[in-house]
């Protein structure tokens, strides 16, 4: 595609600073809901008199709800107003935080966490809203890198803050902190962002939403159950997977018949959809449980690993990993504006594959320094490059007439890949004598498949119905 139209002018700081403040506040609010609670789980067990399994279920409920809401809320924003939907998400999430903060028992806490899951598609919706107000491609790529890197980068810091709050004021203070930030986000988004919708705004395809949500919910639950390995109810896993397959089949058939589908079948058949979603799914499956499970576990293993204490391991692995992604994300965005999103994605994937090769050899000499090196390396290549580009491609590949479907489904692929990663890599790890190395080798093989699939993702500049292409013709 070529165009003689000049590049749109960059926004001035007086325009993009308030916009970024609003969007980053919303991203902060969501990320606190997702990760700030992690170090407070033991405190919650004590204060509520609950079991580890019961508290774990509330976490699973939050992430499952976040995945399901991500499927359709971005598209609903296309139709009724993106700012309206984001403000509503933050408001409802604040109510969920309050419900969790005052919960007298685990049952009420579970309901509160499900309500908080409404904030699930915050990042893709923020990126779509950013796309509407920042028309200059280079400036958009840089700001996209900032938004997405902040989303992952604060995960290592807010967990520390959550642990401090829970230790000094009880776990309920963590939820009150979340509620306050959600309330601030409501005001900031309403005041500092502009409302936008798709050019055409037909009725929402709720008939398509239902089977898709059932399908993804069943598959996610099946993977969570499978992740229990020896304790898993495998009959339940099979039933859930069958229901999930039936749900996807029903969704496909509904989309072929309705006048205004959630996702037109023509889009589902295009490489921008299935190649991107497959790459996201395989990338997450290959790396997520390595960085969030195998490497921290290896670090704490007194026999086969480094024997680092539970209170210290995050400082050696997850925190530097997240901070490396935070620092490098904006650089990746700038690189994408110069070299192209797909090329930078593949650079990140090659680097992540290299990081897993290093990790495989590192298993033989585990110590704090090797763990720190691998964590920073993967923080740059995956969290700072590949993850940023996968999120960005979901935005820049979307057709101008349906900007919400691909980011929403991509968010579902991220969540599905995270669940599948723990189920597959931990199953492999538990099946071999040298379990840590076996799990990492499995992740390495899956990442190679993701890299191969990434070559099927079309370059955004080769598609003539994206927002950038439409703007270029104006």
Name each model-derived stretch.
Residues 38-68, 106, 308-317:
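Extracellular/periplasmic helix-loop-helix junction of adjacent transmembrane segments
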